[in-house]
Protein backbone atom coordinates (compact mmCIF):
# COMPACT_ATOMS: atom_id res chain seq x y z
CA UNK A 1 0.00 0.00 0.00
CA UNK A 2 1.03 3.64 -0.32
CA UNK A 3 1.54 4.11 3.43
CA UNK A 4 4.51 6.48 3.00
CA UNK A 5 2.82 8.53 0.26
CA UNK A 6 2.14 11.41 2.61
CA UNK A 7 5.88 11.68 3.28
CA UNK A 8 7.09 10.86 -0.23
CA UNK A 9 4.77 13.47 -1.74
CA UNK A 10 6.02 16.07 0.75
CA UNK A 11 2.74 16.38 2.61
CA UNK A 12 4.21 15.27 5.93
CA UNK A 13 7.73 15.85 7.30
CA UNK A 14 9.92 13.00 8.48
CA UNK A 15 9.60 14.18 12.10
CA UNK A 16 6.51 12.38 13.35
CA UNK A 17 6.16 14.78 16.29
CA UNK A 18 5.16 17.52 13.83
CA UNK A 19 2.41 15.52 12.13
CA UNK A 20 -0.51 16.28 14.44
CA UNK A 21 -0.28 20.08 14.25
CA UNK A 22 0.47 20.09 10.52
CA UNK A 23 -2.41 17.76 9.70
CA UNK A 24 -4.84 19.89 11.72
CA UNK A 25 -3.64 23.04 9.96
CA UNK A 26 -3.94 21.53 6.47
CA UNK A 27 -7.32 19.91 7.11
CA UNK A 28 -8.68 23.20 8.49
CA UNK A 29 -7.32 24.95 5.41
CA UNK A 30 -9.12 22.51 3.14
CA UNK A 31 -12.38 23.14 5.03
CA UNK A 32 -11.84 26.83 4.39
CA UNK A 33 -11.39 26.14 0.67
CA UNK A 34 -14.74 24.32 0.67
CA UNK A 35 -16.47 27.22 2.41
CA UNK A 36 -15.08 29.75 -0.03
CA UNK A 37 -15.45 27.83 -3.28
CA UNK A 38 -18.54 25.65 -3.08
CA UNK A 39 -21.29 28.19 -2.65
CA UNK A 40 -24.34 29.07 -4.70
CA UNK A 41 -24.79 32.81 -5.23
CA UNK A 42 -28.07 34.30 -4.08
CA UNK A 43 -28.90 31.52 -1.64
CA UNK A 44 -29.61 32.49 1.95
CA UNK A 45 -28.95 30.17 4.84
CA UNK A 46 -31.80 27.73 5.14
CA UNK A 47 -33.73 26.78 8.24
CA UNK A 48 -32.40 29.72 10.24
CA UNK A 49 -35.36 32.03 9.74
CA UNK A 50 -33.27 34.19 7.43
CA UNK A 51 -35.23 35.61 4.55
CA UNK A 52 -33.90 35.27 1.03
CA UNK A 53 -31.19 37.78 0.25
CA UNK A 54 -32.29 40.85 -1.63
CA UNK A 55 -31.38 40.27 -5.24
CA UNK A 56 -29.32 43.24 -6.29
CA UNK A 57 -27.97 43.80 -9.78
CA UNK A 58 -24.55 42.74 -8.51
CA UNK A 59 -25.94 39.40 -7.34
CA UNK A 60 -28.33 38.68 -10.20
CA UNK A 61 -27.84 35.68 -12.55
CA UNK A 62 -28.14 37.99 -15.59
CA UNK A 63 -25.54 40.45 -14.32
CA UNK A 64 -23.22 41.04 -17.33
CA UNK A 65 -20.23 41.84 -15.11
CA UNK A 66 -17.59 39.12 -15.84
CA UNK A 67 -16.46 39.34 -12.21
CA UNK A 68 -19.90 38.69 -10.72
CA UNK A 69 -20.39 35.66 -8.52
CA UNK A 70 -23.03 34.28 -10.87
CA UNK A 71 -20.79 34.59 -13.91
CA UNK A 72 -18.05 32.74 -12.04
CA UNK A 73 -20.60 30.12 -10.99
CA UNK A 74 -21.68 29.48 -14.58
CA UNK A 75 -18.08 29.28 -15.82
CA UNK A 76 -17.25 26.86 -13.03
CA UNK A 77 -20.12 24.66 -14.16
CA UNK A 78 -18.37 24.03 -17.48
CA UNK A 79 -15.34 22.64 -15.65
CA UNK A 80 -17.55 20.77 -13.21
CA UNK A 81 -19.45 18.97 -15.96
CA UNK A 82 -16.25 17.58 -17.44
CA UNK A 83 -15.02 16.47 -14.02
CA UNK A 84 -18.40 14.89 -13.29
CA UNK A 85 -18.41 12.93 -16.54
CA UNK A 86 -14.93 11.56 -15.84
CA UNK A 87 -15.23 10.69 -12.15
CA UNK A 88 -18.52 8.82 -12.53
CA UNK A 89 -16.72 6.23 -14.66
CA UNK A 90 -13.58 6.06 -12.53
CA UNK A 91 -12.44 2.42 -12.28
CA UNK A 92 -15.80 1.06 -13.50
CA UNK A 93 -14.73 -2.53 -12.79
CA UNK A 94 -14.52 -1.75 -9.07
CA UNK A 95 -17.55 -1.12 -6.87
CA UNK A 96 -15.55 1.05 -4.46
CA UNK A 97 -16.09 4.44 -6.08
CA UNK A 98 -19.85 3.87 -6.32
CA UNK A 99 -20.15 2.92 -2.66
CA UNK A 100 -21.04 5.47 0.03
CA UNK A 101 -18.20 6.84 2.10
CA UNK A 102 -18.43 6.40 5.87
CA UNK A 103 -17.32 10.02 6.22
CA UNK A 104 -19.46 12.25 4.01
CA UNK A 105 -18.64 15.97 4.02
CA UNK A 106 -20.87 17.33 6.79
CA UNK A 107 -20.08 20.91 5.83
CA UNK A 108 -21.68 20.40 2.42
CA UNK A 109 -24.53 18.16 3.53
CA UNK A 110 -25.66 20.29 6.49
CA UNK A 111 -28.91 22.00 5.36
CA UNK A 112 -28.12 24.99 7.58
CA UNK A 113 -25.18 25.90 5.37
CA UNK A 114 -25.51 27.71 2.05
CA UNK A 115 -23.79 24.98 0.10
CA UNK A 116 -25.07 22.53 -2.45
CA UNK A 117 -23.52 19.22 -3.34
CA UNK A 118 -21.72 19.22 -6.66
CA UNK A 119 -23.90 16.30 -7.67
CA UNK A 120 -27.05 18.42 -7.29
CA UNK A 121 -25.35 21.32 -8.99
CA UNK A 122 -24.69 19.15 -12.03
CA UNK A 123 -28.27 17.91 -12.04
CA UNK A 124 -29.65 21.44 -11.85
CA UNK A 125 -27.36 23.19 -14.29
CA UNK A 126 -28.83 24.27 -17.58
CA UNK A 127 -25.86 22.66 -19.30
CA UNK A 128 -26.82 19.17 -18.10
CA UNK A 129 -28.00 18.10 -21.56
CA UNK A 130 -24.69 19.01 -23.15
CA UNK A 131 -21.31 17.37 -23.20
CA UNK A 132 -18.46 19.59 -22.02
CA UNK A 133 -14.85 18.64 -22.70
CA UNK A 134 -11.67 20.57 -22.04
CA UNK A 135 -8.71 19.23 -23.94
CA UNK A 136 -4.99 19.66 -23.31
CA UNK A 137 -4.96 22.78 -25.50
CA UNK A 138 -7.22 24.44 -22.96
CA UNK A 139 -10.16 24.53 -25.36
CA UNK A 140 -13.59 23.90 -23.88
CA UNK A 141 -16.07 22.27 -26.24
CA UNK A 142 -19.78 22.13 -25.54
CA UNK A 143 -21.68 19.67 -27.73
CA UNK A 144 -25.42 19.16 -27.61
CA UNK A 145 -26.51 15.69 -26.61
CA UNK A 146 -29.61 14.00 -25.29
CA UNK A 147 -30.52 14.56 -21.63
CA UNK A 148 -29.00 12.32 -19.00
CA UNK A 149 -32.23 10.39 -18.46
CA UNK A 150 -32.73 9.54 -22.10
CA UNK A 151 -31.66 5.93 -21.90
CA UNK A 152 -31.55 3.10 -19.35
CA UNK A 153 -27.76 2.89 -19.58
CA UNK A 154 -27.23 6.57 -18.81
CA UNK A 155 -29.87 6.39 -16.08
CA UNK A 156 -28.08 3.59 -14.27
CA UNK A 157 -24.77 5.43 -14.64
CA UNK A 158 -26.26 8.43 -12.88
CA UNK A 159 -27.99 6.61 -10.03
CA UNK A 160 -27.47 8.56 -6.82
CA UNK A 161 -27.46 7.69 -3.16
CA UNK A 162 -30.08 8.98 -0.70
CA UNK A 163 -29.73 12.47 0.74
CA UNK A 164 -27.13 12.57 3.48
CA UNK A 165 -24.91 10.01 1.71
CA UNK A 166 -22.02 10.54 -0.66
CA UNK A 167 -20.38 8.06 -3.00
CA UNK A 168 -16.59 7.99 -3.08
CA UNK A 169 -16.65 9.35 -6.65
CA UNK A 170 -18.39 12.46 -5.33
CA UNK A 171 -15.51 13.05 -2.93
CA UNK A 172 -13.04 12.72 -5.82
CA UNK A 173 -15.18 15.14 -7.83
CA UNK A 174 -14.96 17.73 -5.06
CA UNK A 175 -11.17 17.35 -4.77
CA UNK A 176 -10.76 17.95 -8.50
CA UNK A 177 -13.17 20.90 -8.48
CA UNK A 178 -11.31 22.63 -5.64
CA UNK A 179 -8.00 21.97 -7.42
CA UNK A 180 -9.39 23.51 -10.63
CA UNK A 181 -10.61 26.58 -8.73
CA UNK A 182 -7.24 27.09 -7.04
CA UNK A 183 -5.25 26.47 -10.24
CA UNK A 184 -7.10 28.40 -12.97
CA UNK A 185 -4.08 28.29 -15.27
CA UNK A 186 -4.55 24.57 -15.82
CA UNK A 187 -7.96 24.06 -14.12
CA UNK A 188 -9.03 20.51 -14.99
CA UNK A 189 -7.81 18.40 -17.89
CA UNK A 190 -9.12 14.93 -18.66
CA UNK A 191 -6.82 12.35 -17.09
CA UNK A 192 -6.35 14.11 -13.77
CA UNK A 193 -9.14 11.89 -12.46
CA UNK A 194 -6.90 8.88 -13.14
CA UNK A 195 -4.12 10.47 -11.06
CA UNK A 196 -6.22 11.38 -8.03
CA UNK A 197 -8.16 8.08 -7.98
CA UNK A 198 -5.38 5.78 -6.69
CA UNK A 199 -4.32 8.32 -4.05
CA UNK A 200 -7.82 8.71 -2.70
CA UNK A 201 -8.45 4.96 -2.76
CA UNK A 202 -5.31 4.38 -0.70
CA UNK A 203 -6.21 6.89 2.00
CA UNK A 204 -9.94 6.04 2.07
CA UNK A 205 -9.20 2.33 2.61
CA UNK A 206 -6.43 2.81 5.17
CA UNK A 207 -6.81 0.58 8.26
CA UNK A 208 -6.33 3.70 10.41
CA UNK A 209 -9.70 5.40 10.87
CA UNK A 210 -8.12 8.86 11.11
CA UNK A 211 -6.67 8.58 7.61
CA UNK A 212 -10.02 7.31 6.37
CA UNK A 213 -11.95 10.15 7.99
CA UNK A 214 -9.69 12.81 6.51
CA UNK A 215 -9.00 11.08 3.19
CA UNK A 216 -10.50 13.96 1.20
CA UNK A 217 -8.29 16.72 2.59
CA UNK A 218 -5.15 14.59 2.69
CA UNK A 219 -5.70 13.39 -0.88
CA UNK A 220 -6.20 16.96 -2.04
CA UNK A 221 -2.80 18.11 -0.75
CA UNK A 222 -0.95 14.98 -1.92
CA UNK A 223 -2.58 15.31 -5.34
CA UNK A 224 -1.65 19.00 -5.49
CA UNK A 225 1.98 18.19 -4.68
CA UNK A 226 2.08 15.39 -7.25
CA UNK A 227 0.52 17.63 -9.90
CA UNK A 228 3.20 20.24 -9.21
CA UNK A 229 5.67 17.65 -10.51
CA UNK A 230 3.69 16.36 -13.50
CA UNK A 231 1.36 19.21 -14.51
CA UNK A 232 3.53 20.06 -17.54
CA UNK A 233 2.39 16.75 -19.05
CA UNK A 234 -1.14 18.18 -19.19
CA UNK A 235 -0.22 21.50 -20.85
CA UNK A 236 -0.10 21.15 -24.62
CA UNK A 237 1.83 24.39 -25.16
CA UNK A 238 4.76 22.85 -23.25
CA UNK A 239 4.78 19.57 -25.21
CA UNK A 240 7.96 20.32 -27.14
CA UNK A 241 9.85 21.94 -24.26
CA UNK A 242 12.34 19.99 -22.17
CA UNK A 243 9.73 19.63 -19.44
CA UNK A 244 6.97 18.61 -21.86
CA UNK A 245 5.53 15.22 -22.67
CA UNK A 246 7.05 14.98 -26.18
CA UNK A 247 10.56 15.21 -24.73
CA UNK A 248 9.74 12.50 -22.19
CA UNK A 249 8.31 10.18 -24.83
CA UNK A 250 11.45 10.59 -26.93
CA UNK A 251 13.47 9.87 -23.79
CA UNK A 252 11.71 6.48 -23.56
CA UNK A 253 13.03 5.61 -27.02
CA UNK A 254 16.52 7.00 -26.42
CA UNK A 255 16.70 4.93 -23.22
CA UNK A 256 15.45 1.86 -25.10
CA UNK A 257 18.12 2.45 -27.75
CA UNK A 258 20.77 2.28 -25.01
CA UNK A 259 19.33 -0.87 -23.45
CA UNK A 260 18.07 -2.85 -26.46
CA UNK A 261 19.11 -1.41 -29.81
CA UNK A 262 17.64 -4.33 -31.78
CA UNK A 263 14.17 -3.74 -30.38
CA UNK A 264 14.54 0.02 -30.83
CA UNK A 265 15.40 -0.41 -34.52
CA UNK A 266 12.45 -2.78 -35.03
CA UNK A 267 9.99 -0.23 -33.63
CA UNK A 268 11.61 2.50 -35.75
CA UNK A 269 11.41 0.33 -38.85
CA UNK A 270 7.69 -0.23 -38.27
CA UNK A 271 7.22 3.50 -37.66
CA UNK A 272 5.76 2.83 -34.21
CA UNK A 273 6.15 6.21 -32.57
CA UNK A 274 6.21 6.58 -28.77
CA UNK A 275 3.20 8.90 -29.07
CA UNK A 276 1.12 5.85 -29.98
CA UNK A 277 1.45 4.30 -26.52
CA UNK A 278 3.93 6.11 -24.25
CA UNK A 279 1.82 9.27 -24.10
CA UNK A 280 -0.78 7.47 -21.99
CA UNK A 281 1.82 5.50 -20.04
CA UNK A 282 3.70 8.64 -18.98
CA UNK A 283 0.89 11.16 -18.59
CA UNK A 284 -1.24 8.90 -16.42
CA UNK A 285 1.68 7.23 -14.61
CA UNK A 286 0.62 3.81 -15.94
CA UNK A 287 -2.69 4.03 -14.07
CA UNK A 288 -4.60 2.77 -17.12
CA UNK A 289 -2.37 -0.21 -17.87
CA UNK A 290 -2.85 -2.26 -14.70
CA UNK A 291 -5.39 -3.08 -12.01
CA UNK A 292 -5.62 -0.52 -9.21
CA UNK A 293 -3.70 -2.55 -6.56
CA UNK A 294 -0.89 -3.04 -9.09
CA UNK A 295 -0.91 0.67 -9.97
CA UNK A 296 -0.46 1.45 -6.27
CA UNK A 297 2.48 -0.98 -6.11
CA UNK A 298 4.13 0.73 -9.09
CA UNK A 299 3.54 4.17 -7.61
CA UNK A 300 5.03 3.03 -4.32
CA UNK A 301 8.30 2.28 -6.13
CA UNK A 302 7.99 5.40 -8.26
CA UNK A 303 7.51 7.82 -5.38
CA UNK A 304 10.23 6.16 -3.31
CA UNK A 305 12.86 6.70 -6.02
CA UNK A 306 14.93 9.89 -5.77
CA UNK A 307 14.61 10.36 -9.53
CA UNK A 308 11.03 9.16 -9.62
CA UNK A 309 10.21 10.15 -13.17
CA UNK A 310 13.51 8.92 -14.55
CA UNK A 311 12.53 5.61 -12.97
CA UNK A 312 9.17 5.82 -14.76
CA UNK A 313 11.08 5.91 -18.07
CA UNK A 314 12.91 2.76 -17.02
CA UNK A 315 9.63 1.06 -16.09
CA UNK A 316 8.35 1.86 -19.58
CA UNK A 317 11.53 0.43 -21.10
CA UNK A 318 11.19 -2.66 -18.93
CA UNK A 319 7.65 -3.14 -20.24
CA UNK A 320 8.99 -3.02 -23.80
CA UNK A 321 11.93 -5.36 -23.25
CA UNK A 322 9.76 -7.93 -21.44
CA UNK A 323 7.70 -8.41 -24.61
CA UNK A 324 10.65 -8.00 -26.99
CA UNK A 325 10.26 -11.45 -28.58
CA UNK A 326 6.63 -10.77 -29.48
CA UNK A 327 7.48 -7.28 -30.75
CA UNK A 328 10.38 -8.55 -32.88
CA UNK A 329 8.12 -11.17 -34.48
CA UNK A 330 4.98 -9.08 -34.81
CA UNK A 331 3.83 -6.79 -37.60
CA UNK A 332 2.68 -3.20 -37.08
CA UNK A 333 -0.93 -4.10 -36.26
CA UNK A 334 -0.07 -6.84 -33.79
CA UNK A 335 2.58 -4.74 -32.08
CA UNK A 336 0.26 -1.76 -31.72
CA UNK A 337 -2.30 -4.04 -30.09
CA UNK A 338 0.35 -5.31 -27.66
CA UNK A 339 1.44 -1.81 -26.71
CA UNK A 340 -2.04 -0.39 -26.30
CA UNK A 341 -3.29 -3.38 -24.32
CA UNK A 342 -0.18 -4.46 -22.44
CA UNK A 343 -0.20 -8.26 -21.94
CA UNK A 344 1.89 -8.70 -18.77
CA UNK A 345 0.07 -8.20 -15.47
CA UNK A 346 2.93 -9.17 -13.12
CA UNK A 347 4.11 -5.74 -11.93
CA UNK A 348 6.76 -7.28 -9.66
CA UNK A 349 8.44 -8.71 -12.76
CA UNK A 350 8.26 -5.31 -14.46
CA UNK A 351 9.68 -3.45 -11.45
CA UNK A 352 12.47 -6.02 -11.09
CA UNK A 353 13.39 -5.53 -14.75
CA UNK A 354 13.30 -1.74 -14.36
CA UNK A 355 15.68 -1.98 -11.39
CA UNK A 356 18.02 -4.17 -13.46
CA UNK A 357 18.01 -1.55 -16.21
CA UNK A 358 18.68 1.15 -13.63
CA UNK A 359 21.61 -0.77 -12.14
CA UNK A 360 23.10 -1.52 -15.56
CA UNK A 361 23.94 2.12 -16.23
Task: Identify the residue ranges that each predicted region occupies.
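Helix-rich, well-folded core regions that mediate interactions or catalysis
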Residues: 1-361
Amino acid sequence: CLCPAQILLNYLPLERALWSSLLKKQRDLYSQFLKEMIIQPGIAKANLGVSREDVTLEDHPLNPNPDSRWNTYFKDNEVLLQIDKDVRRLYPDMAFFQRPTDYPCLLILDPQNEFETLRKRVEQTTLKSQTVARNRSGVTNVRSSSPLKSSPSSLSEYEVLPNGCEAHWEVVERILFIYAKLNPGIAYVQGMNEIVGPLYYTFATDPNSEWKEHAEADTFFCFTNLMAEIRDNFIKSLDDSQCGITYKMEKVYSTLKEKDVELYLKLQEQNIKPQFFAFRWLTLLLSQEFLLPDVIRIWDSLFADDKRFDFLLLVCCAMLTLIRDQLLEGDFTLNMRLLQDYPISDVHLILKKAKELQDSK
